Structures are given as structure tokens and as C-alpha cells.
Amino acid sequence: MIDYLYGTLDSKSTDGITIDVNGIGYEISVPISTFLKLPETRNPIKIYIVESTAGMYGGVISLYGFFTIEEREMYLLIKDKVHGIGAKKAMEYTDKISKSFANFKTAIISKNPSMLNEIFGFTKKTADKLIVALKDKISTVNVLNKEKQTGAETIKNTMVSEAIAGLITLGYKMQQARVAVTNVYEHNENITLEDLIKKSLQYL
């Protein structure tokens, strides 16, 4: 089982990348979200891997790569838990969700298809399908990139996301909610979630 590959980025395209590891080239499919974070070729890179086998007796092995652990965890959750979703479709969904893993998690837990539509572009049918499949399982996924976020940033991002989700539940548009919550939080960084929602409503 391959956990990650560390080597030199030999080539890259939206169809996939090749990493040279000690003279061996590994072809890896990646979502657009990972592709956009890649360095220029000939630079070192670390990619987290998912192996997939197909064909009789598992004769064909495909590698799927992700820039962060959270991208990989979300991909595996979707592929394994959402009925009828194969590897390629799971990659497509992961790319959409990578806009904000925290907001996606909040939308699933709060059973909010409108939030899934406005932020990530999922149709109502797909949003409902994701909610049913993931509502009892998504809490096990760590959506915080600990290598890049401090504790203060984590608290801020979580609170802001939850407040925005709360306003959307009350019928406000995503853009309205984001502007209100962001403006209120910038002037009240020690605020509680309940007061953040109340003051955001006053702002609106």
C-alpha cells in the first residue's frame, strides 16, 4: 500500500502527472484542485496516494493523487460511501468540495442542500444524495490542514463557516451571509458563535 510519493515532478497536465521517484516514473491522476497547486516541473513534490485496482484479478492498478491529506480523506469518503460514485466522479466532486472542506462539512451536518448548491454547484438531486450518504459519516473526517493552519485560524474558519451556514438556513443568499459574517467578525474576534449570528443579522 502506497501512502504517499515523494520525488521530482517530471510532467503535468490536467489529465494527470508523472513523478520520478529514484528513476521510476509513476503516472498519477489528480483533481484540478491539486493540479493548480503543483510546482513547475523538475521540482520536488509530495503527493498523497490512493491505489485502485481494476480488471480480472486486480490486474490493472491506477494511482490517484492529492496535494493534502484532507483532499484524500474526502475523496475516499465520497467514493466509498456515496452509492454509484466511481473513481472519476469522486475526483470531480472532491475538486468542487476543495473550495471549502469546512463549509461542505457544515452543509452536510446541517442537511442544507441550498448551501451545497450555492457554494459548490451541486444540483438539488446530487446535494440530497450527498446528505443522505454522508450525514452520519462526515464527522469522522478531519477537514483541517494542520500543516497550514494555526489554532486561531482554525477557530476563526470554523466559526465563520458555521455562522454563514446559519444565515443561509434562515434564507439569506451565500454572498449576503459571507459579507455580513466577515465584516462582523473582523471587528469582534472574541465573539461567540451565537452573538456572531445575531450581529450578522443586525448587519443585514
UniProtKB/Swiss-Prot annotation:
Homotetramer. Forms an RuvA(8)-RuvB(12)-Holliday junction (HJ) complex. HJ DNA is sandwiched between 2 RuvA tetramers; dsDNA enters through RuvA and exits via RuvB. An RuvB hexamer assembles on each DNA strand where it exits the tetramer. Each RuvB hexamer is contacted by two RuvA subunits (via domain III) on 2 adjacent RuvB subunits; this complex drives branch migration. In the full resolvosome a probable DNA-RuvA(4)-RuvB(12)-RuvC(2) complex forms which resolves the HJ. Its main location: cytoplasm. Residues 150-154 are annotated as: Flexible linker. Residues 68-149 are annotated as: Domain II. Has three domains with a flexible linker between the domains II and III and assumes an 'L' shape. Domain III is highly mobile and contacts RuvB. GO terms for molecular function: ATP binding; four-way junction DNA binding; four-way junction helicase activity. One of its GO terms (biological process) is DNA recombination. This is Holliday junction branch migration complex subunit RuvA. Belongs to the RuvA family. The RuvA-RuvB-RuvC complex processes Holliday junction (HJ) DNA during genetic recombination and DNA repair, while the RuvA-RuvB complex plays an important role in the rescue of blocked DNA replication forks via replication fork reversal (RFR). RuvA specifically binds to HJ cruciform DNA, conferring on it an open structure. The RuvB hexamer acts as an ATP-dependent pump, pulling dsDNA into and through the RuvAB complex. HJ branch migration allows RuvC to scan DNA until it finds its consensus sequence, where it cleaves and resolves the cruciform DNA. The keyword DNA damage applies. The lineage of its organism: Bacteria, Pseudomonadati, Elusimicrobiota, Endomicrobiia, Endomicrobiales. Keywords: Cytoplasm, DNA damage, DNA recombination, DNA repair, DNA-binding. It is found in: Cytoplasm. It comes from the Bacteria. One of its GO terms (cellular component) is Holliday junction helicase complex. Pfam families: HHH_5, RuvA_C, RuvA_N. Residues 155-204 are annotated as: Domain III.
